[in-house]
């Protein structure tokens, strides 16, 4: 069974508290999502493979380390996942970026996929699948399904806030997937929103649809 790791760094928790506030502006919300994603990236990328590389410093030749093989692929679930991409790219600028577009049917609460654009070599890359929220788990499960259909095997799901119901569903559907979150909240309400959560992340990042 994949792990669910809550990254409880003090800076992340402080910024997440500001992010949750109803009065936080769109500008500040966007910046905070970017900053939290970057801070989480250090932990999420902890097991990236390294290889030796010969370099010349101003003083001497030396053998040092660099990321090995194919670099990351960062795949946001549209639209809210876009807000996390730049923070992760600031750590690994060579990463490729794909997109999986989904929206939620507000009556059934089920996700509907409308776009899949991925790097051609997605099956050779470690993937950070990103979405600020893991609520019902439906979008995450469908996105992982899409990635696996295209040969992807090394996938981590990265979110800012998760509900226990969504974590359980994702782990049951894809027990090989590790989940990284800045907070594991209490529950989902009758409308499928995380409580206490932070509202509709897409609307708070980009404005109402």
UniProtKB/Swiss-Prot annotation:
Pfam families: UPRTase (PF14681). It catalyses: UMP + diphosphate = 5-phospho-alpha-D-ribose 1-diphosphate + uracil. It is an enzyme of class 2 (transferase). Uracil binds at residues 194, 199-201. Pathway: Pyrimidine metabolism; UMP biosynthesis via salvage pathway; UMP from uracil: step 1/1. 5-phospho-alpha-D-ribose 1-diphosphate binds at residues 79, 104, 131-139, 200. Its cofactor is Mg(2+). Transmembrane segments: none annotated. Binds 1 Mg(2+) ion per subunit. The magnesium is bound as Mg-PRPP. Allosterically activated by GTP. GO terms for molecular function: GTP binding; magnesium ion binding; uracil phosphoribosyltransferase activity. InterPro entries: PRibTrfase_dom, PRTase-like, Upp_B, UPRTase/APRTase, Ura_phspho_trans. Keywords: Allosteric enzyme, Glycosyltransferase, GTP-binding, Magnesium, Nucleotide-binding, Transferase. Its EC number is 2.4.2.9. GO terms for biological process: UMP salvage; uracil salvage. Catalyzes the conversion of uracil and 5-phospho-alpha-D-ribose 1-diphosphate (PRPP) to UMP and diphosphate. Belongs to the UPRTase family. This is Uracil phosphoribosyltransferase. It comes from Streptococcus pyogenes serotype M49 (strain NZ131).
């Amino acid at each position: 069974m994949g792990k669910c790791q809550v990254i409880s760094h003090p800076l992340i928790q402080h910024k997440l508290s500001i992010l949750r506030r109803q009065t936080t502006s769109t500008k500040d919300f966007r910046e905070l999502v970017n900053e939290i994603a970057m801070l989480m990236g250090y932990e999420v990328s902890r097991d990236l493979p390294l290889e030796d590389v010969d370099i010349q410093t101003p003083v001497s030749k030396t053998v040092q380390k660099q990321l090995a093989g194919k670099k990351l692929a960062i795949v946001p679930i549209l639209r809210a996942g876009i807000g996390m991409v730049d923070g992760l790219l600031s750590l690994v600028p060579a990463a490729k970026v794909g997109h999986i577009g989904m929206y939620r049917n507000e009556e059934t609460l089920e996700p509907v996929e409308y776009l899949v654009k991925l790097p051609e070599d997605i099956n050779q890359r470690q993937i950070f699948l990103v979405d600020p929220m893991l609520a019902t788990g439906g979008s995450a499960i469908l996105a992982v399904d899409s990635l696996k259909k295209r040969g992807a095997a090394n996938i981590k799901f990265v979110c800012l806030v998760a509900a226990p119901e969504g974590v359980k569903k994702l782990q049951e559907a894809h027990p090989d997937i590790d989940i990284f979150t800045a907070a594991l909240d209490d529950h989902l309400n009758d409308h499928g929103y995380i409580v206490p959560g932070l509202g509709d992340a897409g609307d708070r990042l980009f404005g109402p649809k």
